[in-house]
Every structure is written in C-alpha cells, then in structure tokens.
Amino acid sequence: MADYTRQRIFFVDDEVTVRRVVSRTLERLGAKVSCFARARYCLERLRSKRCDLLITDVKMPGMTGIELLTEAKRVAPWLPVLVITGYGDVPMAVRALKAGALDFIEKPLDRKRFLSVVEAALQRSAPIDRLLGKALTRMEIAMLCLLLEGKSNREIAQLLHRSIRTIESHRSRTMRKLGVTNVVDLVRRAAALGLTELPTPQTLKTQR
C-alpha cells in the first residue's frame, strides 16, 4: 500500500454513524481525515486549510453535496472531489461529474470498492508544487490586498517596508499557493476565497 500519511481527506455527511465508520475506514490508509456534518463547515475549512481529497454525500440539509462541489472548485480548482450518491441515482451522478467531480460512489458503500476509488484519487491528487493549497501568511495576504488595489511591486514594497525583491518573492509564493499563473486568475481566486476583509499594511508594520 502506498504511503498517504502526508495527505488530508475531508469527508462530509450529515449522519454521525456514517462519518464514524468512513473515518475509521479512511484512516487505515494512513491519511489524516477531517469529518464535517454540514457542507458549509467543510467549505469554511477549505478556505484556510490544505485538502488533498474531498468526499461528500449529496443529499444533506442546507448546502447539498453538488453545491459544495461547485463552491469547492472555485476555491481550489485542482482539488479532486468524490461524490457519494444513492444506488441507481444516475442523473445525480451525471450532475456531479459535469460539476467537476472526479468520480462518484454508490450507496451502500462497498469497503473494497470505496478504498480503491479513494486510493486512485489520492495518487492523482499528489501536488506537483509543494506550496499548492497551503494557507497564506499575514504578509502574503497584505501584499495581495495591495496588489488587488492596483498597486505596483514598488508601491507595495514601500507600503510594507520591504525590498522589491521580497515583494516579488511573496507574490510568486502567493500565486503558487493559489494555483494561478496570472493576475486575472489571481483576482478571481481571491474573490472565490472571500478575501475581502484583509488586514491593512499598518497592522503588519511590527512583523518586519
């Protein structure tokens, strides 16, 4: 069996018994498993923590699994998502695949089939860039705030009391963490992450 000890799985299901059983099953792979009773709780965690695989049920109170899938892809387009659907619910499975799901798993869950699909997804999700999906530092967030305001690297350097080279480094790391290669996609990703209430440069003056 491959080593999955460095990978993180988010599992979402509103039934506590299912969460408990699935968590124990997934932990046998060695991966770190975080379970959520509501899709919105999972989405909140996705905005700040790295996740290598998201597994979600479809029919849940509040935000459904399909809605979570759609929002998760806005936050982390590279994230593989597996959707659990009821037996024979083909239309739902088709919707999930069209929304960006890597695969779907039918209920009732067959342990062998379930683990096989999960392992395939984890192998596929191994990030090429070690920074991809990591949380932004306070300085990177402040830099991003000024960048989104239209400030140049030189202006940002002056406001944050850093060298231009340091700002360029922060900018490069920020784009790598968010999985983007240009400013347009950076703006879109920042909006998807809800980065609207960012700290002002003044709050970071002591972090020099």
PLM feature spans:
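Receiver (REC) domain active-site loop signature in two-component systems and cognate sites
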Residues: 60
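Acidic, metal-coordinating helix/loop segments flanking the phosphotransfer/catalytic sites
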Residues: 35-53, 74
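Basic, Lys/Arg-enriched C-terminal extension of HTH/homeodomain DNA-binding domains
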Residues: 175-208
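Conserved acidic segment of CheY-like receiver
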Residues: 3-18, 22-26, 54
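Acidic catalytic/metal-coordinating carboxylates
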Residues: 37-38, 64-67
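C-terminal output helix
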Residues: 89-91, 105-118, 159
